[in-house]
Design a protein with these regions (language model features):
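Short, mixed-charge, low-aromatic patches
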Residues: 4, 114-117, 204-213, 270-273, ...
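Hydrophobic alpha-helical and helix-loop surface patches within well-folded domains
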Residues: 1, 8, 196, 224-230, ...
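Acidic/His-enriched low-complexity segments
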Residues: 1-273, 299, 376-377, 401-407, ...
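Non-catalytic accessory/interaction domains
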Residues: 2-4, 163, 168, 237, ...
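Charged, low-complexity, helix-prone segments enriched in Lys/Glu/Asp/Gln
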Residues: 19-33, 157, 248, 353, ...
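General secondary-structure propensity
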Residues: 30-39, 332, 734-739
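Small/polar loops that bind or transfer phosphate-bearing groups
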Residues: 67, 318, 756
Length: 890
């Protein structure tokens, strides 16, 4: 350990982690956290006592603990009290002169959080009750208790949690004992300490705590004798005021189906003692795979009408987190370079489980439409990176929970299963668990078992797919000399600056109109595209029908087996712009191709919106339908030229209002159309505003008489109307306040904040800007959700209203980053970036002279040493802006 260790440095590097891992081996943690005073909101901290035992390979050496504390009272190492003034910094605690076997005890206090990082505290606006939960990944366990915060230093944890006697107190493992604390601080004067059974070996980032007056429902999964899995107790938690939205029967059905599926698939028992799932407020993520106590955003509890796409999305997240019990929890990556070893696998396995074990059999269609869209966007940024990434420190790790690590990785694993065969892929997974259970692994470890299972050397495949960046592009063309149909491929790795042609196993489909004018598959052919120098041109064999004749669609990547942007030939493009597609996966693939063309400036936004207006009503899959109409809204707001925007908006508005009246009353697609209509309305100019007001005003006033049949005026629908009317200046603050008082919940509170911030009044605009920049409003610290709500309102209406604040944005960036947690700083900067702009005259190249483009680029040029994570946000936002302006100017 270097003599000049900076005890205030929170950004642990990969090299520091490797050095520490080589020096020490962790054994056991005993962690006691006391939240009995949490209901006193003036109290900012809580006490912790942590005892940790570990071995040292080089006695006499030094190491350090990670701890982002409020205070440290004592540090005792091997029976010796250390001078806290000498060994304690803001982020680390020095442990000098180690013995072969060591025990350290730290007594300190930690801070409650309002950012969703560490110990988050939330007060329910409906009943005043206080709720706590923890969120640690990648490195926020150190905000709660001192530890060695890196994934390869696994240990057994024994946890004790003190809190009010009438609260639920929970952790990863089942309760093993409970004792009364004589002088507690709970509302009834009593507190208890709950002891939990010790865990198997696990990493710090997947330990967890839950405390509060949570509503609980229980059930049991019967086990899986073939794999040796015992009966498992199941639990569901939510806030008391969310209990009516907790559809426990559905949630338990999905959970049991997942446990059955993964035990059959992996043959490895779940051995974490219980399987609780908690739905918590103000959550930064979709969910977190804490073994024994998985946490989810309570957005997955539906208080208003929910679509099947929402239920499918929730089921997918449940399965994703469950897959982590094996990929991530049982076997954990050594360092964050290999984050894909858990996230890519969980994304793939989660979608597979939903498709094969639940009623949502079309989950691969939704994956093709939604998840891959995220991947394609992320992979085209200047910040793109390989799936197996170069993560030098924790700050870089936080930024790589992105569409590449999740959705691109999952798509590549789907291609891998096609490449080596599903049986070989699953066999490799089983062997991977057998070899590395309760330990850590790296890319080479998985490639080794995959090579054995498939009988192939997988190194070249891994180099092409896992260790390069960028999106391959595939298209079909007729070979000039022979007339053969060939698959063409282009690929460029922007990170390495070189061409890369990847191997693909894919299908090419031929579609022709049926009697109803719907494009139906008439033939298909499997094609093996080689990687390397011969991968640019591959002949398609055995595709009946040829390349000439009447209307037809030739679709490369039929069945969506691989990861690539698809180019459509001119005849195929004409076909899909005139006819709907019958097959759900093909339909999703076609719409993804059209959206890529729009984003790339190859298809005018007007043409894309026209296609959506004409054809979207014939998309039966609500997940694809909602994605496509949302993309059309984005096309209007960001890609349509200013001179055409209101005309294009009117085309889409008519299509959506027609959908409200003609699509099945009360249907999922009707609700999706309403949501998109609300988004589209917020930026409307005077010439189109009245069209929206006619539909949205009755919603805002809960007047069912003038609404389309089946359109329920629930809380969500009402606030869709109110938020749009606020942005248009067609409702006032007292009306918004009164609506909020009608129904006080966490969600209506956030919607109210957004609506007030959206009011097109200079005073409200300034109030919202100042609050987000200060992180406080009316003397109250903003939580993560409230900060986002204000930022969304600030940017909701016409861009000219936010323009006066643009020049004030850039000087604040470094101060925001240094003074806030990573999560809150990211929300602030993403939320206030001036992303909605009109192109300047002069064509695509002239957009480099756009004032906001110049300001953003100047900031990057002037701040080369700014934190990489901060620079990445600006680089990506700037890339989005450049893309939009170029499309407008094309």
């Amino acid at each position: 350990m270097p003599d000049t260790l900076n005890l205030d440095q929170a950004n642990l590097t990969r090299q520091e982690a490797a050095d520490r891992s080589a020096l020490i081996s962790t054994h056991d943690y005993d962690v006691h956290v006391d939240v009995s005073g949490a209901q006193d909101l003036d109290r900012v901290d809580y006490p912790t006592v942590t005892t940790l035992s570990f071995s040292c390979a080089a006695p006499g050496s030094s190491t350090f603990l990670d701890y982002l504390h409020h205070s440290v009272e004592t540090v005792e190492l091997n029976g010796v009290m250390l001078d806290v003034h000498q060994v304690v910094g803001a982020a680390r605690i020095l442990l000098p002169d180690l013995q072969a076997e060591n025990t350290v005890t730290v007594v300190g206090t930690s801070l409650y959080s309002s950012s969703g990082e560490g110990m988050h505290r939330f007060q329910d606006p409906a009943d005043g009750q206080v709720y706590l939960y923890t969120q640690y990944e990648p490195a926020d366990a150190r905000r709660v208790f001192p530890n060695f915060e890196q994934p390869d230093l696994k240990a057994r944890f024994t946890v004790h949690l003190t809190g009010p006697a009438d609260w639920v107190l929970a952790s990863n493992q089942p309760e093993s004992g409970r004792r009364v604390v004589e002088q507690g601080e709970g509302p009834d004067g009593g507190s208890v300490t709950v002891d939990f059974s010790h865990t198997p070996a696990l990493s710090t980032y997947i330990t967890t705590l839950l405390a509060g007056p949570y509503h609980r429902v229980e059930d049991t999964w019967g086990g899986h004798p073939e794999s040796g899995a015992p009966e498992v107790r199941l639990g569901l938690y939510c806030r008391q005021t969310m209990a009516t939205a907790l559809d426990s029967d559905t949630l338990f059905t999905v959970t049991k189906a997942g446990l059955d599926f993964f035990h059959e698939l992996f043959g490895v028992p779940y051995l974490w003692g219980k399987y609780d799932q908690a739905f918590v407020p103000e959550y930064n993520l979709g969910a977190m795979e804490n073994p024994g106590l998985v946490t989810f955003t309570e957005q997955y509890l539906f208080e208003s009408q929910a679509t099947q796409a929402q239920f499918e999305g929730r089921a997918n997240t449940i399965m994703h987190e469950m897959a982590h019990m094996w990929f991530g929890d049982l076997v954990t990556m050594t360092w964050w370079d290999d984050l894909w070893l858990k996230e890519s696998f969980a994304d793939y396995m989660g979608t597979l489980a939903v498709a094969e074990a639940t009623e949502h059999t079309g989950s691969w269609t939704t994956f093709a439409s939604r998840r891959k869209a995220w991947a394609y966007v992320q992979d085209q940024y200047p910040t793109t990176h390989p799936i197996f990434a170069d993560i030098t420190d924790l700050e870089a790790a936080r930024q790589n929970f992105d569409g590449i690590t999740y959705a691109k990785g999952a798509s590549v694993l789907k291609q891998l299963a096609a490449y080596v065969g599903r049986d070989a892929f699953i066999s490799a997974s089983r062997e991977y668990f057998a070899r590395h259970a309760w330990g850590n692994a790296e890319l080479a470890d998985f490639l080794a078992v995959l090579g054995e299972a498939s009988g192939q050397d997988m190194q070249a495949w891994a180099e092409a797919w896992l260790q390069t960046s960028g999106v391959p592009e595939l298209w079909l063309e007729a070979q000039g000399d022979t007339g053969d149909l060939v698959v063409r491929q282009e690929g460029f790795d922007p990170a390495a600056g070189r061409t890369v042609l990847r191997p693909h196993v894919l299908k090419v489909g031929r579609y022709e109109p049926d009697a109803q004018g719907v494009l139906a598959r008439v033939s298909s052919a499997e094609v093996e595209v080689p990687g390397g120098s011969t991968g640019d041109r591959t002949v398609v064999e055995n595709l009946p029908g040829g390349t000439n004749g009447g209307t037809r669609l030739l679709l490369v990547n039929d069945e969506d087996l691989t990861y690539a942007k698809i180019r459509l030939d001119e005849e195929s493009l004409r076909a899909v712009l005139a006819h709907p597609v019958q097959d759900s996966l093909a339909r999703a693939t076609v719409w993804a191709a059209l959206w890529s063309m729009t984003r790339d400036g190859l298809m005018p936004s007007r043409q894309f919106v026209d296609a959506v207006a004409r054809l979207s009503a014939q998309i039966p899959d609500v997940g694809v339908y909602s994605q496509v109409i949302d993309q059309a809204v984005t096309a209007v707001e960001h890609f349509a030229p200013a001179a055409e925007r209101e005309q294009v908006r009117a085309v889409l508005a008519k299509a959506l209002t027609d959908a409200l009246r003609r699509i099945g009353p009360g249907s999922d697609r009707q609700r999706s159309a309403l949501r998109s209509l609300g988004r589209l309305a917020r930026g409307a100019g005077e010439q189109t505003a009245d069209r929206f007001v006619q539909v949205l005003e009755p919603l805002a006033h809960q007047d069912q008489t003038d609404l389309p049949d089946g359109l329920a005026v629930d809380a969500e629908a009402r606030w869709i109307g109110l938020n749009a009317l606020a942005a248009l200046g067609r409702v006032d603050r007292p009306t918004l306040d009164a609506a909020r008082e009608d129904e006080v919940t966490a969600r209506t509170t956030a919607w109210h904040w957004t609506a007030v911030a959206a009011l097109p009044e200079p005073r409200m605009r300034t109030r919202a800007w100042n609050a987000v920049m200060a992180g406080r409003l009316d003397g109250q610290q903003l939580s993560n959700d409230h900060l986002t709500a204000l930022a969304q309102g600030f940017t909701a209406s016409r861009p000219d209203l936010a323009a006066p604040f643009t020049d004030r944005f850039w000087p604040e960036l470094e101060g925001i980053w240094s003074s806030r947690s990573n999560g809150l700083a990211s929300r602030t900067i993403h939320g206030l970036f001036p992303a909605t702009q009109d192109a300047v005259p002069g064509g695509p190249a002239a957009q480099e002279s756009h004032p906001v483009v110049q300001s953003a680029q100047s900031w990057l040029d002037d701040h080369p040493a700014a934190p990489r994570a901060l620079r990445r946000i600006i680089v990506e936002e700037l890339d989005d802006l450049r893309r939009a302006l170029r499309a407008q100017a094309s």
